[in-house]
Amino acid sequence: MKKLVAQSVIDAFFDGTHSDPFAVLGMHETHNGIEIRVLLPEAHRVIVIDKETHKAVVELELVDERGFFNAIVPKANQFFAYELQVYWGKESQILEDPYRFHPMINELDNWLLAEGSHLRPYEVLGAHFVEYDNVAGVNFRVWAPNAKRVSVVGDFNYWDGRRHPMRFHPASGIWELFLPKVALGQLYKFELIDSNNQLRLKADPYAFAAQLRPDTASQVSALPEIVEMTEKRRAANQSDKPISIYEVHLGSWRRNLENNFWLDYDEIADELIPYVKEMGFTHIELLPISEYPFDGSWGYQPLGLYAPTSRFGTPDGFKRLIEKAHESGINVILDWVPGHFPSDTHGLAAFDGTSLYEYADPKEGYHQDWNTLIYNYGRHEVKNYLSGNALYWVERFGLDGLRVDAVASMIYRDYSRRDGEWVPNQYGGRENLEAIEFLKHTNYVLGTELPGVAAIAEESTSFPGVTLPPEHGGLGFHYKWNMGWMNDTLEYMKLDPVYRQYHHGKMTFAMLYQYSENFVLPLSHDEVVHGKGSLITKMSGDTWQKFANLRAYYGYMWAFPGKKLLFMGNEFAQGREWNYQESLDWFLLDDGQGGGWHSGVQRLVKDLNKTYQNQTALFELDTNPQGFEWLVVDDNQNSVFAFERRSKSGEVIIVVSNFTPVPRDNYRIGVNEPGKYEEILNTDSAYYKGSNLGNYGEVIAEEIENHGKAQSISVMVPPLATVYLRLKK
């Protein structure tokens, strides 16, 4: 038995500490001739087969009983393609030797990844099906620059880290290994010996599929095909188009009635898409679906950033859901969470023994509110990981927009921190300059590669220029959630109407900054959780008043400048607070159980969406001051508001809201134009379970001066109601 490799080297393989397997294993030219070395723990015999002649060339010698084989190939003077016939006791199988293949990452990809400027890093890193030298398999790559050894482990090698150590590329910090015959759906992880000599088992940060919790392995899955953006979908995102967003948590919109289990992506699509279409929403916004370990995070603490959650099926199933939405003319927005990640040991935390993805200093890298870690946006590879992820979801699944979660927590270093708990930037300021640059870069990439995709910011401060283009010094988002409008108006609606006169400005203040950004008016999931109650329970008064208040509020919201967002269940005034573990209370739409109140609100929201889409005055000039004018802004005594909305072509709608339970008959409002004003929507209609007061179809302008206008109209403003009056041309 001739040992051609030093025993210390062999021992290092079986100890799992050898960091350069390709320097030893596979086929090598030596002064003795062509030599083949194989590491196959627990194998008994290994015969080398010439792939061209299919003949046995040499039987390798077992030089270490733990499973290390080598031999000089007789009469061979050049490398050749081979496979191995391996005997495990009496059984044998034909195997490819992963260590006979050359490096597969090309120099350009390696350089771009090292620089952190690869536009689509997910096309290189992770697990990819490839064919090399007529051999099909999966190429695994992972970034772990400070690891001392990395192996691929999975159900194809008994999760044994000794069997498949990877090749290291020092210039980029990437480890690589091509494994023949690995199949779709097989489970895998990366086993690392980290910088501190600790053994770590990590899921693939770039995995396209992952196991459902509590299991944590990545799953081999094909890179989804590119979905081309269409002009119709692109146009639907523009600021001069009607955008009415239905926000959905897939795990609780509907559930299986028999066992309370989740529906899968296809079952959800079959029910959700027709419903959204029928209700008249233009967009669906999905709470995060990147794989996440904790159900109670609702997806806002993701670990598998490239993997659609397996709670509801496969990546293909998710893609079909989006396709069905597009077939029905509905755009899809995804909640995206690039701000932080959980500290689960199988995830990104201390990935290679160092703070690789997160800031090292807890004053920068630990989020005490959520017990999560904050991405190190100053590290080019991390920025590349996240920006690439944004492009991946939009390009590979056909999403029409991304809503970026918790932007304020990203751009401020002192977010939710006291003095002494945060680290200033290089200029001594509180802004996270790296995060700001990351957001600008990501929005620039999306805008350049996929023009028309909507980028929406949930940004809760007055940070300037959120929706300005990056080239003009802005963050580059297309829309920003108007959290100020939401907070102010909900505070107003909670008040007894008697006290609303003292808080009149809460309903009007948003107009002072309306044109500083492009806004979305959000009534989101955040307002119906954590003890806040449902929207209907926030309204003041008895049952009649609560529902009338909500209807009036919706009417006001749909006419106010800004795109609309409504969380699921709010469209029918769900009575209880949202519970992510249960279906919405759809039974309330049965008038026998809901008293007709809930179905009335649902009919109103449907009609609001229809009216909104059909009346250009309500959306075309959302971002232009010419599209809005207060007609009555100071009548705090009666808690009445009136304003005019106008389109590019001069179409006019007068909106009047009364937020007291007292009808305002013959209420005079000055208008800009004479003519007949048709009542096109009244939230007090009996159709919506209102008291059915109104204006008999229309009102006519008279030459009676009011509020500085030569013309005026006399309106019956129902109690706790909003009325839309359209000027007949």
Curated annotation (Swiss-Prot):
HAMAP family: GlgB (MF_00685). It catalyses: Transfers a segment of a (1->4)-alpha-D-glucan chain to a primary hydroxy group in a similar glucan chain. One of its GO terms (molecular function) is cation binding. GO terms for biological process: glycogen biosynthetic process. It is an enzyme of class 2 (transferase). The active site is at residues 405, 458. SMART domains: Aamy. Catalyzes the formation of the alpha-1,6-glucosidic linkages in glycogen by scission of a 1,4-alpha-linked oligosaccharide from growing alpha-1,4-glucan chains and the subsequent attachment of the oligosaccharide to the alpha-1,6 position. This is 1,4-alpha-glucan branching enzyme GlgB. It comes from Mannheimia succiniciproducens (strain KCTC 0769BP / MBEL55E). Pathway: Glycan biosynthesis; glycogen biosynthesis. Belongs to the glycosyl hydrolase 13 family. GlgB subfamily. InterPro entries: A-amylase/branching_C, Branching_enzy, GlgB, GlgB_N, GlgB_N_E_set_prok, Glyco_hydro_13_cat_dom, Glyco_hydro_13_N, Glyco_hydro_b. PANTHER family: 1,4-ALPHA-GLUCAN-BRANCHING ENZYME (PTHR43651:SF3). Its EC number is 2.4.1.18. Keywords: Carbohydrate metabolism, Glycogen biosynthesis, Glycogen metabolism, Glycosyltransferase, Transferase. Monomer. It comes from the Bacteria. GO terms for cellular component: cytosol.
